[in-house]
Amino acid sequence: MPSRIDPERLRNSLPALSEAVAASAETLHYQTYYGLDLPHRTQVQRRLGRFRVHDYDVVAQAWWPEQPHASLLILHGYYDHMGLYRHVVDWGLEMGFAVLACDLPGHGLSSGPRASINEFAEYQAVLSGLFEQARQLDLPRPWHLLGQSTGGAIALDHLLHQAENPDLGRTILLAPLVRPRAWLRSRISYELLRRFVQQIPRTFSENSGDPAFLEFVQSQDPLQPDILPTAWVGALSRWIPRIEGAADSTHAPLIIQGEADMTVDWQHNLPILERKFAGAEVLRLPEARHHLVNEREELRQAYFDFLRERLK
């Protein structure tokens, strides 16, 4: 049975992220349930709070090791939330980074219609808000940006369309979304359905080689949405041409892509990203599926080693 976590009640009880207050029992329960308390890291400070973006209350968390020398800002994927990213948080702390993450609107503890968004431009507003939180917390520069799937889409959109950010370090794209797999069929289905239904039931996929993770997400995670809103698909369909039509960039992201990924159309996406970002460095993992943040340990270590060499 999933743990009893009431996201609305917990969110409403939280202070602003910029305020340092003692964690409530409900906050501690949430962090312990998802392993975000990281009990083996006894010298790490952590904080859970919220900030406002448009009409959304966005819930965020920060972790500080002793004497951090840079920061890692994390953007999760569609249907995900911060609670599923403990491996990346732990790796960031091991690297000596302060770590900052948030739940996107409609996900995890943040407000908004479940698993939906009006336009992908709202995700850019959330990223701008996350940067502002990093400034208020005075997180050490540079700020490395890591995005998984839709989080990677948000990050690459920022690189392609926003002014140069002097605080930004390297950008890490894990299985980044440009087009999902079978996009033409999905788009036709969307056009047929959007006038008649607002959502369809979610179909869970085996998007990781870690069976314990798949079991947790499908039966033990109380923050998992169980619908696919047609509004989100519509927002995606309007966003894809913005990315595919964008001018090339001088940024040099680090791209990790699994070749067993059945969620995004990586054979289409990778050539586009390699054209947009001529300086990109790409690591392809033949056995890795889509959810790289929660792949088998040996696959996680393979890309952590790749990143460590480039961020040390």
Place the predicted regions along the sequence by residue.
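An N-terminal hydrophobic leader/cap segment in hydrolases
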Residues: M1-R52, V58-W64
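Active-site glycine-rich loops that stabilize anionic/oxyanionic intermediates
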Residues: H69, G77-D80, E259
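Catalytic nucleophile-loop/oxyanion-hole region of alpha/beta-hydrolase
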Residues: Y78-L84, H107-D138
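Conserved alpha/beta-hydrolase
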Residues: V89-P113
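Alpha/beta-hydrolase-fold enzymes
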Residues: L146-A231
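Short beta-strand/loop motif that positions the catalytic acidic residue
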Residues: S249, I255-D261
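Short alpha-helix in the alpha/beta-hydrolase fold that links the catalytic acid
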Residues: H251, D265-E274
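Catalytic active-site module of serine/aspartate enzymes centered on a nucleophile-bearing elbow/loop
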Residues: A280-K312
